[in-house]
């Protein structure tokens, strides 16, 4: 990939938030009987991506999926790779490659290997529409409270929300995609009057309740704040930025890493 293009993709922040957080309404979905007979691969490779058909197809499997509180199988990371100075990717810095071939860019003094492998597993669940894996990566209390909130306030569930997020990401790639790179940075302070984590959990007060962050710090071993970028390859082999400069929070509890999101 062209060096200038790659750098520009990773610095572009316009594509991240809206694509990743949108949710759909279960009552708005149409019957999937006709769509379920079609191949999801065929749908994904059309020039004009059919979001409704894709959502219906994956929702059939997601509705059957079970939530899991078992730790996901994370695999391992290879040795640190330092690109040559004249390499097109040198500006991205050092990386390590996971068992699935994803390049992970991170400072291991800020973000442990297990956290990064959990992040990879988490985002790969959106690429494969695997709700069981998704649920195994998310902090259980968050999942439970978000489920209750969606049911009460919006009349749909986490599976519907998950399917909508999978569909939005696939739509951004014009079809099915696979992860190629994940970059995690320590974010700058967003608000001088408070730290990032305090501000982050204040945004979820209506869902998680008052003093949630304060109580959370007593229940877990550590809370991590990160800013990440995700690149992916579409069915045509082109690598594109999928998510840019998006905040994410992890916790470590009993040796295991969980995502809030």
List PLM regions with ranges.
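Bacterial signal peptide processing site
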Residues: 24-27
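C-terminal motif of bacterial Sec signal peptides marking the signal peptidase cleavage site
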Residues: 18-22
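Exposed beta-sheet edge and beta->alpha loop/turn motif
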Residues: 34-35, 47, 52-57, 181-261
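Short, low-complexity N-terminal intrinsically disordered segments enriched in polar/charged residues
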Residues: 50-124, 128, 144, 152
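Hydrophobic alpha-helical targeting segments used for export or membrane insertion
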Residues: 9-15
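Short solvent-exposed beta->alpha transition segments
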Residues: 77, 82-88, 93-105, 135-216
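Bacterial N-terminal signal peptides that target proteins for export
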Residues: 1-9
């Amino acid at each position: 990939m062209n060096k200038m293009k790659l750098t520009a993709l990773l610095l572009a922040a316009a594509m991240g938030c809206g694509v990743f957080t949108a949710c759909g309404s279960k009552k708005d979905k149409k019957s999937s009987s006709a769509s379920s007979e079609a191949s999801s691969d065929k749908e994904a490779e059309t020039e004009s991506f059919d979001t409704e058909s894709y959502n219906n197809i994956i929702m059939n499997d997601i509705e059957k999926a079970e939530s899991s509180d078992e730790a996901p199988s994370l695999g391992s990371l290879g040795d640190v790779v330092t690109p040559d100075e004249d390499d097109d990717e040198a500006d991205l810095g050092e990386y390590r490659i996971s068992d699935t071939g994803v390049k992970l860019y991170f400072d291991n003094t800020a973000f442990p290997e297990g956290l990064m492998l959990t992040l990879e597993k988490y985002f790969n669940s959106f690429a494969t529409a695997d709700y069981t894996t998704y649920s195994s990566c998310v902090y259980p209390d968050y999942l439970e409270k978000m489920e209750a909130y969606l049911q009460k306030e919006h009349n749909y569930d986490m599976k519907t929300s998950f399917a909508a997020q999978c569909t939005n990401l696939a739509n951004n790639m014009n079809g099915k995609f696979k992860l190629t790179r994940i970059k995690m940075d320590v974010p700058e302070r967003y608000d001088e009057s408070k730290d990032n984590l305090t501000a982050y959990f204040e945004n979820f007060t209506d869902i998680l309740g008052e003093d949630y962050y304060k109580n959370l710090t007593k229940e877990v071993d550590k809370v991590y704040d990160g800013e990440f970028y995700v690149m992916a390859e579409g069915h045509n082999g082109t690598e594109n930025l999928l998510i840019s400069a998006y905040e994410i929070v992890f916790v470590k509890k009993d040796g295991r890493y969980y995502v809030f999101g």
